[in-house]
């Protein structure tokens, strides 16, 4: 099969449907087919457009497939999705999308399906979604927001008026969020440097020290990135790390640190002094932290492979601790569209809640009296956020909720158990944080 961007996208989509881990699968397929430049960008655009709109694409295709999509061979299913995505969302002419899809059936040795692909796409590409009649609000949300049933039901229950927008809202204005390294520059100066290099739509974000920019390629391709002038990190994530209020000379723990963005911000706040222990449970993810720290030139960071649910004698008592715990990820559904189709299994959710609670208890033991603990997630699930903090305070009366010095952006929902960012209200990722003080 000759290498081409459409074939690469379809091959990656077949693997993604089987195995998940969308970004890793796409990267591997692009390397395997040796795509570069525009071809690489086009393949990536097809892949992520299908993931982002899969619910809508599938609904439309099902109107013209009496036996349904599930009965088709996986390559044929993904060829249909990819072609419809191009015609509907990527401004590719219908004739080109259809003709190239028919060619792909031969490339994937599915020539017997070429007639079906041609006939279905010529009708599907002109389908008017405004004429659709949905069975109920859940189906409407699954189709218009491109979500699985479990996620659609969660959003309909908890955020009924914002559900579709939460699924599709582009956090940080659809731009890449950066953190200026204050040891080398500041946000205003970084904006000027990026603009001088031809980067478009550069502006400061709402979180102090953040910068938003639109890059033609990867932000990691910039010389300023390689020189440690900035790292890539969402504004909501930056806000959580700022609430730790790390100071020079302190001992600070980042318990669930990979891939390392918050560690870098904490090291910056500490002015590369004191000791920052940056930990993660997987060694390959710890290596990501090491790579980022080395690029930025920090010498006050010690990396450690560590299970944060257990007390590790290698970790000292700390002045400040950040616990950015594993979570359901329901706050970043637009950024990671494959999460929209996850099963919200009650048993797995109970395990996740227990893991979060165990990490909080570990942090409580490691924190010095008078110290600051910040708990954060990238979910908008109340059980993992406000209710988790309420339960922690019941177990640990030596803690109280603290008010961070950093001002929260407009739209944050602040309660007695922490602060919540909902994308449609703040313009940032869905995120939760709570600053806690150990009083004795």
Where are these regions (language model features)?
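S-adenosylmethionine
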Residues: 1-440
């Amino acid at each position: 099969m000759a290498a081409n961007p459409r074939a690469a996208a379809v091959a990656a989509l077949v693997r993604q449907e089987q195995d998940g881990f969308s970004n890793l699968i796409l990267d591997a397929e692009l390397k395997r087919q040796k795509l570069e430049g525009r071809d690489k960008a086009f393949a990536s655009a097809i892949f992520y457009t299908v993931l982002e709109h899969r619910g809508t694409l599938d609904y439309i295709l099902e109107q013209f497939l009496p036996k349904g999509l599930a009965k088709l061979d996986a390559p044929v299913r993904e060829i249909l999705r990819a072609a419809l995505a191009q015609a509907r969302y990527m401004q590719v002419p219908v004739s080109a999308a259809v003709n190239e899809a028919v060619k792909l059936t031969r490339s994937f040795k599915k020539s017997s399906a070429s007639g079906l692909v041609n006939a279905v796409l010529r009708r599907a590409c002109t389908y008017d979604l405004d004429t659709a009649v949905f069975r109920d609000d859940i189906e409407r949300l699954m189709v218009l927001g491109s979500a699985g049933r479990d996620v659609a039901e969660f959003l309909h229950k908890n955020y009924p008026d914002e559900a579709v927008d939460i699924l599709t809202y582009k956090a940080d204005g659809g731009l890449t969020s950066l953190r200026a390294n204050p040891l080398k520059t500041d946000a205003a100066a970084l904006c000027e440097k990026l603009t001088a290099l031809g980067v478009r739509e550069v502006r400061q974000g709402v979180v102090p020290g953040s910068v938003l920019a639109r890059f033609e390629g990867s932000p990691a391709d910039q010389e300023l990135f390689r020189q440690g002038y900035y790292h890539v990190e969402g504004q909501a994530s930056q806000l959580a790390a700022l609430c730790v209020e790390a100071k020079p000379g302190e001992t600070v723990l980042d318990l669930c640190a990979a891939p390392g963005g918050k560690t870098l911000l904490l090291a910056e706040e500490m002015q590369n002094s004191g000791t920052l222990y940056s930990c993660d449970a997987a060694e390959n993810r710890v290596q990501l932290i090491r790579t980022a720290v080395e690029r930025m030139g920090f010498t006050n960071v010690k990396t450690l492979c560590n299970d944060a649910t257990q007390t590790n004698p290698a970790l000292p008592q700390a002045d400040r601790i950040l616990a950015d715990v594993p979570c359901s990820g329901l706050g970043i559904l637009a950024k990671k569209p494959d999460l929209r189709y996850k099963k919200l299994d009650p048993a797995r959710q109970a395990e996740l809640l227990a893991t979060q609670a165990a990490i909080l208890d570990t942090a409580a033991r490691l924190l010095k009296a008078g110290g600051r603990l910040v708990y954060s997630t990238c979910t908008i699930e109340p059980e993992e956020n406000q209710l988790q903090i309420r339960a922690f305070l019941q177990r640990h009366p030596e803690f109280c909720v603290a008010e961070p010095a950093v001002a929260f952006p407009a739209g944050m929902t602040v309660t007695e158990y922490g602060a919540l960012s909902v994308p449609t209200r703040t313009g940032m990722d869905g995120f939760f944080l709570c600053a806690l003080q150990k009083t004795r």
